[in-house]
Amino acid sequence: MSDLLNRRLSLLGANLPLLKQCLHGIERECLRVTDEGRLAQTPHPESLGSALTNEQITTDYSESLLEFITPALPDPAQVLESLEQTHRFVYSKLGDELLWSPSMPCTLPAEEDIPIAEYGASNIGKLKHVYRKGLALRYGRTMQCIAGIHYNFSLPEALWPLLRASDGNEQSDRDYQSAAYIALIRNFRRYSWLLMYLFGASPALDKGFLRGRPHQLEELDAETLYLPYATSLRMSDLGYQSNAQAGLTPCYNNLASYTDSLRKAVGTPYPPYVEIGTHVDGEWVQLNTNILQIENEYYSNIRPKRVTYTGERPIQALTSRGVQYVEVRCLDINPFLPVGIDLTEARFLDAFLLFCALEDSPLLDNGECGQCTDNFLTVVKEGRRPGLELRRDGHPIELKAWASDLLGRIGQLAELLDRAQGGDEHAKALAAQQAKVDDASLTPSAQVLARMGEHEESFIQFSLRQSRLHAETFREQPLPTERQQAYETLARNSLAEQSRLEQEEVGDFDLFVGAYQASILAISN
């Protein structure tokens, strides 16, 4: 335990009410499927509103890939309640369709038959669609159908000046806050393998997902591929394999180096993309021919974030106003849970992220960067292997020993959160994770394989059974009339807003894309 962490724990202990002001938000992606478990080919239901302008129900890559977004709230229980209500509303509009329960996709149609999300005729709507066409061109449509949970978290704004004073730091509050979030991200890189062990839930997938590509997976049955000790094949290197992004590892030494590396990637041509061009047969196929079309194309396990103004790019927001929160992007959907995540997981994530924020976080050199990546990939592919060793400070250490050590340190943050909020919910959440470390059969990834074995099911059969169970849960609990009407109003207003944007649109789309592209080059640190 570092002296720095001890000092910061004492500071928090003297300011416990502040810990009630952390903010949390969840984004859950899930595929719409037919009642037989095939990808829905229907358009995004109009009764859910506009995917462009509805702030709570939208689409991700595909017209069939829904995304539910909660507001940012101080209590994770409220966040999960909001997410659950959104599921209940959506099920009131889905007819016979289902929401697919796990992260790895259902039976997919031919690559060209996976529908790309549509956002209407406004320039911003077209830009979102062309960006997704570019993703299809660069990475294939199949990979874009993987779903996940994103967990957004911020520390209280009032805490940063106290920490800065305690550290004797002379930066501005804004710069100190940004540096502290980047330090959190460095520690997240060091320790996120633990989340993969505890919450990874994708040890198997449908054989058709790989489209005949070479792989190192084993056959579980005629339709299912898996690895016996895998925790999260979703986060393994069978997912995104991008030669263009291979050399792009944004430096997490400070905010400026991070935004600078992304800005360069958005402005640097990549020869294979240049060869294709932005148009084929007069149609847009990608926004530009650079390493990244836009910043969000960079695939990472965690992102520093700042809420953007209308028309503002993420890098512009970060550069001008600093980091506001982090977005954790490596969490699998738990197929046993109706909304894919529960309060126990959320409470542990809060303690884990607080630990990452407050523990000493030295800069990562190239050697440690590689070690972090290796540990992460080892755990997603074989995290439950008995006696598995990772590397800490260049030396081997058994996963179980390191995990128990980390949980002991994170436990001090859980204790503080419980003191601030009353009760012992965070301590219980921590104990549930220690139980998984002691007994790997309790992990979600082990449970998935165990259930498939018990029922003699393929991945698709298991997933469809879970999806139907959750559908029944939601359909049997319609929303109270008042809440249902609030969602209906949100949907109607979003459709009206999209219509207004389209009617008021001025200017040519090509010029709009040019201006959008130029905006990134005008930013200076």
From Swiss-Prot:
SUPFAM superfamilies: Glutamine synthetase/guanido kinase. The keyword Repeat does not apply. GO terms for biological process: glutathione biosynthetic process. GO terms for molecular function: ATP binding; glutamate-cysteine ligase activity; metal ion binding. Keywords: ATP-binding, Glutathione biosynthesis, Ligase, Nucleotide-binding. InterPro entries: Gln_synth/guanido_kin_cat_dom (IPR014746), Glu_cys_ligase (IPR007370), Glut_cys_ligase (IPR006334). This is Glutamate--cysteine ligase. It comes from Pseudomonas putida (strain W619). The lineage of its organism: Bacteria, Pseudomonadati, Pseudomonadota, Gammaproteobacteria, Pseudomonadales.
